[in-house]
Amino acid sequence: MAHSTPCSQTSLAVPNHFSLVSHVTVPSEGVMPSPLSLCRYLPRELSPSVDSRSCSIPLVAPRKAGKLFLGTTPPRAPGLPRRLAWFSIDWEQVCLMHRLGSGGFGSVYKATYHGVPVAIKQVNKCTEDLRASQRSFWAELNIAGLRHDNIVRVVAASTRTPEDSNSLGTIIMEFGGNVTLHQVIYDATRSPEPLSCRKQLSLGKCLKYSLDVVNGLLFLHSQSILHLDLKPANILISEQDVCKISDFGCSQKLQDLRGRQASPPHIGGTYTHQAPEILKGEIATPKADIYSFGITLWQMTTREVPYSGEPQYVQYAVVAYNLRPSLAGAVFTASLTGKALQNIIQSCWEARGLQRPSAELLQRDLKAFRGTLG
């Protein structure tokens, strides 16, 4: 993966696919509107302001350009200057390094911001579903201003884009790590050995990672935020071996879901990890994340994929026939610890959300289980 040229003190190194232009004016009407009422994702005092400034190249704006959002300054991110606020970007301090990955709604790059490693996500103008792209951008900002060891933090965000840019907005995030839990589970490291011959995650490591994720969920739920796309690919592992929940493009705030029983909002996500009530189009609750965690814990334990077959058949069977991944393997049946782990997983993916544990209860059970291992 090629790196860009080094950055100067006053410029942004951009990937090759960005075309340089001599002068681009951002029209006053070019600020991306929220597809939903502003109070759903941002307090009204943090709503986008209009400020038509020029920029010399895509993703670069003058150093003293006006803030895109108005409001008080949240606590600063560790390692970054005290004056920084999440609702504005100091573009002169951004230096892109290389692309980390891309998906349906945009691309993620490794970069530095004020000399600190960060990840930068650009949300594209998805021609097939522009509204979905907009929702993804605003949903990512549900966690703006929040800080927790097991959540990837939003450092800064901007809706500012040049006229010819394909980006709806830019989000600068804490760099959570180069490795995802998915890569660790399935050993996606280009090892020549077949998966069946490779070392499995130890039970202790599974519990450590599980507690990291549940701690993150407990914090999110305490802030009335649902992730709604929890899976190993959306869990980063830092250099300090700490799991951090990332990718909040499907997240929702609980207050936005209340009172909408007749017309639940569209919820994205991954069908293999979606709770039955979500597949049925019902209103989401924190228990939907607990279900997704149960599937994730099963993956950590077995290193297998949850289902095979056509997605529509799997979704129907999950709802109609209570289909779940198999718990018949030796890892669950050969020991008392395996049986205890089986019970935890089974409780997480109960058909009815009310029967699943809360994140708080799950945290307590996992800690107690870890204590029995000595």
UniProtKB/Swiss-Prot annotation:
Residues 94-370 form the Protein kinase domain. SMART domains: S_TKc. It comes from the Viruses. It is an enzyme of class 2 (transferase). ATP binds at L100, G101, S102, G103, G104, F105, G106, S107, V108, K121. GO terms for molecular function: ATP binding; protein serine kinase activity; protein serine/threonine kinase activity. Keywords: ATP-binding, Kinase, Nucleotide-binding, Oncogene, Serine/threonine-protein kinase, Transferase. Its EC number is 2.7.11.1. The keyword Plastid does not apply. The active site is at D229 (proton acceptor). It holds the Pfam family Pkinase. It catalyses: L-seryl-[protein] + ATP = O-phospho-L-seryl-[protein] + ADP + H(+); L-threonyl-[protein] + ATP = O-phospho-L-threonyl-[protein] + ADP + H(+). PANTHER family: SERINE/THREONINE-PROTEIN KINASE TNNI3K-RELATED (PTHR44329), V-MOS MOLONEY MURINE SARCOMA VIRAL ONCO HOMOLOG (PTHR44329:SF285). Belongs to the protein kinase superfamily. Ser/Thr protein kinase family. This is Serine/threonine-protein kinase-transforming protein mos. The gene is V-MOS.
